[in-house]
């Protein structure tokens, strides 16, 4: 760790976790007995270590059809959603409750967090309460001034891969300011071929200095190609599994027997790239059998166990993918975050992980996968 003073250490009921606010390094012990680490991973934290805070209630990018144009089925239904953004006062209430308990806020919701009317104030509130903010953006409204704010306050920023000039422009603006920049790439049946093209090209050419896209002309020319290049200098590409939620369709879901997906997993398992490769926890059931992936790097669904989502109108959900039906919602106008976290509603959600697939050797690594959209679980075993 570069700066020990930036490392926050939290002692929970029977384990210890630590987070470095500068590097993003996270570590937790196994369950502790008599001061010794048993090696058994704790099931949950006593308070969410990460909160996905939905500060956006509507989306300019989605409203004008740009998500659909890029072939992305927005799980927040940004095409139709027209709710107000979270108020600054509500955000302050959240941050105050999380001070000293939560390491990170993932700013999100239905829209680009950098377009919130109080974006700078929100970042300042995070800093005042010792919480590191991160967020994902389409990049549609990214500016140099916003990129500077990101450098000043954020741990990292992810740009969704929308295959457009503004995608690359946003990435390059962030990189120019020294922001740790990731790409979020939605992995679906219709994007698998393109994902394979990216990885094969970058694996073969990872020592070649690729285009820097210094002008709008370069951007437009690049965007006319079948598959854009990931800009040089990005920290990681994080693959997010497509879910049939909101505008996402079941027809575009990946299945475990998809040959392109199996080839994709082989490539990730066998090769190295000029950037890190990551996945959301929804993909873990498909990753646990990869022999060159360190099992310690895999963490299955953390919803309701380590993290939670807060809607723009202040409902706590175990995961943002419950944003449409809100089956496991708890109203924060009536309960504190701590009370909602310990509620029967959240316990019902967690029971899925405790009781799923009890006889499977991978139970502790997978826990049965997603309780919200079980059809996305990429496992060839039925328990």
What are these model-predicted stretches?
Residues 42-89:
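Canonical Radical SAM [4Fe-4S] cluster-binding loop centered on the CxxxCxxC motif
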Residues 59, 63-74, 351-383:
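Cysteine-cluster motifs in flexible loop/terminal segments that predominantly coordinate metals
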Residues 88-110, 115-241:
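Radical SAM/AdoMet-radical enzyme domain recognition
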Residues 257-291, 315-367:
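C-terminal accessory region of radical SAM enzymes
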Residues 290-299:
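Short, basic/aromatic recognition patches
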Residues 301-304:
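Short, small/polar residue-rich loop motifs at catalytic or cofactor-binding pockets
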Residues 310-311:
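Short, acidic, Ser/Thr-enriched surface-loop or helix-capping motifs
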């Amino acid at each position: 760790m570069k700066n020990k003073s930036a490392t926050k250490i939290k002692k929970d009921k029977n384990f210890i976790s630590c987070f470095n606010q500068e590097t993003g390094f996270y570590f937790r012990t196994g369950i502790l007995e008599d001061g010794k680490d048993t090696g058994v991973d704790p099931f949950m934290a006593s308070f969410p270590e990460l909160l996905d805070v939905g500060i956006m209630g509507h989306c300019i990018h989605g409203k004008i059809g740009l998500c659909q144009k890029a072939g992305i089925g927005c799980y927040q239904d940004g095409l139709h959603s027209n709710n107000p953004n979270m108020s600054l006062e509500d955000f302050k209430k959240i941050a105050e409750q999380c001070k000293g308990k939560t390491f990170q806020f993932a700013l999100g919701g239905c829209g680009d967090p950098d377009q919130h009317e109080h974006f700078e104030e929100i970042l300042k509130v995070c800093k005042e309460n010792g919480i590191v903010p991160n967020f994902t953006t389409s990049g549609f409204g990214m500016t140099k001034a916003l990129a500077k704010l990101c450098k000043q306050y954020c741990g990292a920023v992810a740009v969704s891969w929308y295959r457009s000039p503004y995608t690359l422009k946003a990435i390059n603006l962030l990189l120019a300011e020294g922001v740790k920049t990731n790409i979020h790439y939605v992995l679906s049946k219709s994007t698998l071929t393109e994902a394979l093209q990216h990885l094969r090209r970058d694996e073969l050419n990872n020592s070649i200095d690729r285009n820097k896209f210094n002008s709008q002309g370069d951007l437009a020319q690049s965007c006319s190609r079948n598959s854009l290049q990931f800009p040089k200098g990005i920290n990681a590409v994080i693959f997010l599994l497509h879910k049939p939620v909101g505008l996402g369709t079941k027809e575009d879901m990946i299945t475990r027997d998809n040959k392109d997906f199996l080839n994709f997993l082989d490539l990730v398992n066998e090769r190295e790239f000029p950037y890190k490769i990551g996945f959301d926890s929804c993909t873990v059931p498909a990753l646990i059998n990869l022999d060159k992936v360190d099992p310690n790097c895999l963490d299955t669904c953390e919803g309701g166990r380590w993290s939670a989502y807060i809607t723009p109108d202040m409902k706590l959900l175990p995961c943002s993918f419950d944003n449409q039906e809100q089956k496991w919602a708890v109203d924060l106008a009536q309960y504190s975050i701590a009370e909602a976290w310990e509620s029967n509603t959240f316990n019902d959600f967690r029971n899925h992980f405790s009781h799923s697939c009890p006889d499977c050797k991978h139970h502790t690594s997978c826990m049965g996968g997603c309780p919200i959209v079980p059809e996305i679980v990429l496992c060839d075993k039925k328990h």
